[in-house]
Each structure stands twice: as structure tokens, then as C-alpha cells.
Amino acid sequence: MDSTKECVSIRQMGASGGRLRIAGTVNDSIVDGEGYRYSIFTQGCPHACPGCHNPQTHDFQGGRLVEPEKLMREVLANPLLEGVTFSGGEPFCQAAVLAALAAQLHENGLDIWCYSGYTYEQLTGCREQSVRHLLQQVDVLVDGPYLEAQRDLTLSFRGSGNQRLIDVPASLKSGGVVLYQPEG
């Protein structure tokens, strides 16, 4: 996908009746963002990147439906968690449910990281209000599709050189991309 192209539509599927369609969760991740994290792997992805680390998450009808409140209870049950990561699949395909969940997580002092095959520019150019709401709740966005030709195992928190770690609040405030600098 062309990162300068306006994103006019992001397929909003997978969620049903306020529930989230997920492939699974990891209760104690240290690889899906900084700190000790709870990771939610959403189900459904339109990108189907060759070499994807999670190809089982591509099917929009796969996975299972869960109540966001159940995930919230699991997260809050662990006082050691520093944040929650939305991965996939493509989280922005279930933007409305995730935006509401992210707002509750923020209220409880947790930060939000989100992996997306869309670029920051595509997301900010998207017309769906729910996509904008989710983006406003994200602290760090790992953007862009995984590109096998740019695979780089030395990168922190990303798989290929085209992907960026973006400080979303600073980027939204400045009107341009502000890269996030990992600690250490």
C-alpha cells in the first residue's frame, strides 16, 4: 500500500454486538511493546502480508467473540501490568470496540500500544469516526505492513524496516509524525 494514499475505508468487521472477535491473548508479554504487557490479538486482517507472524488471525470469521469487560477484568487482575497491546489481525477493523476498551484502560493508568498494517497517514486520512477515536486512544503505534524483503530482527518491537514506532499523542498535536524512542 502507498503510505501517502488517503485511507477512505477500513473494513469494520469482526465485532458483533459490542463484543470483540479475537484470536487470543497473552497475559504477560515483554515483546509486544515496552514494559510488562497484556496483548490482545484481534481476529481478521485485510492485509495478509506474506510472511506474517500471525497468519491464523487473517480470517474475519475465525477466532472467538469476547466481551470487552472480560478482557478488562483479566487486565486489572494483574497489578504488575504497565500496558496493553492491540495486535492482530488488524485492530483498526474493530476500532469502535477497541477505542472504548482503550479509554477504560487509560482511566486505569495503562498505556496502549497498537500494531497496524495501515500507515499513520492512512489512519489519519480515514473517514471512519471509530478509526479516529481508536487512534486518539493509542500511545504508541507500530505502523505499516510487514514486508518480508525488509525483515530485520535487530529492530525493537517491529519485524520490518518500513514499520515505524510512532508517538501518537505527540504526532496528533504536531500535525506530523513524531517517532517514539524506546527506552534503553
Can you say where each PLM-predicted feature lies in the sequence?
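N-terminal [4Fe-4S]-dependent radical SAM core
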Residues: 2-41, 50, 54-60, 177-178, ...
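Conserved Radical SAM active-site core
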Residues: 13, 17-24, 36, 54-134
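Glycine-centered loop/turn positions within well-structured domains
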Residues: 47
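Conserved C-terminal portion of the radical SAM core fold
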Residues: 78-86, 142-148, 172-184
